[in-house]
């Protein structure tokens, strides 16, 4: 891979056409291979390898429960979960591959643009799990079979119900500019979080930078991770969050905490977290088995129930009490544009918010 120290834009210079819109419509290789079912031969080969390494930006408790479910289903294969933020996952793999270290088998990132880089660099392995071929929408799978949407979620507005009455809560991003919210808003940073970078791109595209200029005058609390605004909200340090993980709000609310999600009338930013296998996988059969498991109905139901995430697998059931995904207006994801404009967005945001 390229030097992981150079900019996101530099790493993808000239490759913006690799991804069109929200769809994973990369066209730089052959067509996707035929879908592969889980067979006794694959299971036997995977058990001979005995392990699989999963690099992920998924919340650690969710990743660990996924790993335990796989180990329970396929005894004798240990899953090593390496969990960190999406940017650090990307950097680590870049550093390892630059040193000819092939330690990762399967990867997940909350920054879909990472998969553009890995695919362009020719280090992802084409592999299509049977469930992906049968059930996943076209726009949620790479046409060359190198990755697919393992999880989706939203970056949303939310509020602390102990500090804000429901009829006074913001209903839109425009509402956050009301002077009554000055000093009461928390927001994450696109320079740190892949989720917030994606959300910031969609918001500046749909709302314009003028909205951010007005928000910057609201004396917001600036935090780093997309998981931080829900935490500040829960603690009562701020009354409203302008962005952050929907799934954290679900988890907190269902645990009895005083938080409530809001789906902005302008649309909520859509975040996509794909999974892929590396060509240099040291455990290729275990990698295929784990990848197939991740996209199965059972695993997808697990990330919904345990992780508060969304799934495009049509056989899953949404958890009662959560607003159905089909009823939510969302903004359009565009990973290629995020990669192309990411550095400029970070620079402009940092200058605007002075942090």
Name every feature range the model reports, one short phrase each:
Residues 1-24:
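N-terminal secretory signal peptides
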Residues 113-117, 239-258:
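A ligand-binding cleft/hinge motif common to bilobed small-molecule-binding domains
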